[in-house]
Regions:
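Non-heme di-metal
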Residues: 1-335
Length: 339
């Protein structure tokens, strides 16, 4: 299990106190403390709450996963985050238009995969891979929450989702599980493959891209958004993965380092068709009222991925690290005398 990270403000400090058994969630009052919904403090607090449903943390009681007071606290963090996301996206219920927009690749893009393919340095590639490990070492897990929420009798959507997930989990071969292939790439780059090793240095935009998956996946209410977010990944990943293969080759790294991205160039090109023709179409055939939620899932994840891309490229273009430097001093939690 990963170790608990350092706090990034009063809210995350308070959640860490709860997880460490130093106080009860029922004692927390967040009034006036939830400020920037995209900031480090709220995003880490949410990440901590969500991680209890995955691997949790060393020394944290398993019973806290379903502690009603901690779940209520999480809900008070989710509200401002989701409201802020929805305020920044166009909305609507035209799924076809949202998907078609994903299929348009710019001739001259500016995101991190473009940067790394053209001029990226080895240290920047390492940072990218390290930061993305927060998702890729549990790749496909957030989307697995939606499986029991899809119709299994008229199972077109469920069958297509399971086909893709089956591939993500190695199609029965442990060494081909995508999280395992990602860890192999990290090892080839000399990075720490421990689950959660880079949480302390992951800035808020990284946490937000993972948190939105967990938020949508853990709420049946947002099953349509979870499917939309999953569609975004499968439709848009092949071109970016191809550029990352180019970046690895340009840097003179051995072919095995690029295997993860090479796998996604091929596999996700097939997955794109499954997602469009069966998963999305099958879901909306049974539950057409979820169209707006599917669009939200696509738009929300696009927004947060763009925020992350802006952060990475801005830092790298300025000759700076994109990693976050943890605070030297402990943060005062909500409700403490120093808060």
């Amino acid at each position: 299990m990963p170790v608990l990270p350092r706090a990034r403000g009063p809210v995350s400090a308070a959640v860490l106190d709860v997880l460490a058994g130093r106080r009860a969630a029922a004692d927390l009052d967040l009034t006036g403390h939830v400020e920037d919904p995209f900031g480090d403090d709220l995003q880490l607090a949410l990440y901590l709450c969500y991680e209890l449903h995955y691997r949790s943390f060393d020394g944290v009681a398993d019973d806290l996963e379903w502690d009603p007071d901690l779940l209520a606290l999480r809900a008070r963090l989710e509200g401002p985050f989701l409201d802020a996301v929805r305020a920044r996206v166009a909305g609507g219920d035209d799924v076809d238009a949202a998907v078609e927009a994903l299929l348009v690749e710019p001739a001259d893009g500016t995101g991190p995969s473009w940067h790394l393919a053209r001029v990226g340095e080895r240290a920047q590639l390492d940072e990218y891979v390290a930061l993305r490990s927060l998702y890729h070492l549990k790749e496909a897990d957030p989307q697995a929450w939606v499986i029991p929420r899809l119709d299994g009798v008229a199972g077109r959507a469920k069958a297509s989702l399971m086909t893709v997930e089956h591939d993500e989990y190695g199609a029965g071969r442990p060494e081909r599980v995508h999280a395992r292939i990602y860890a192999d790439m990290m090892e080839g780059l000399g990075l720490d493959t421990t689950y959660g090793a880079y949480l302390d240095v992951a800035p808020a935009p990284v946490l937000a891209t993972v948190n939105i998956m967990s938020l949508f996946g853990l709420h049946r209410r947002w099953r349509g958004a979870s499917v939309g977010q999953f569609a975004l990944i499968e439709i848009t990943s092949p071109p970016g993965a191809a550029r990352l293969v180019t970046a690895i080759e340009r840097l003179g790294l051995p072919p095995e380092v690029s295997e993860f991205y090479a796998e996604h160039v091929e596999a996700d090109a097939v997955h794109e068709q499954l997602v469009r023709k069966d998963l999305l179409a099958g879901l909306l055939e049974r539950e057409p009222e979820l169209a707006a939620d599917v669009v939200l899932g696509i738009q929300a994840s696009t927004l947060l991925e763009d925020d992350l891309a802006d952060h990475l490229v801005r830092c790298w273009s300025a000759g700076e690290s994109a990693l976050r430097t943890p605070p030297a001093a402990p943060q005062s939690p909500v409700g403490s005398s120093a808060a």
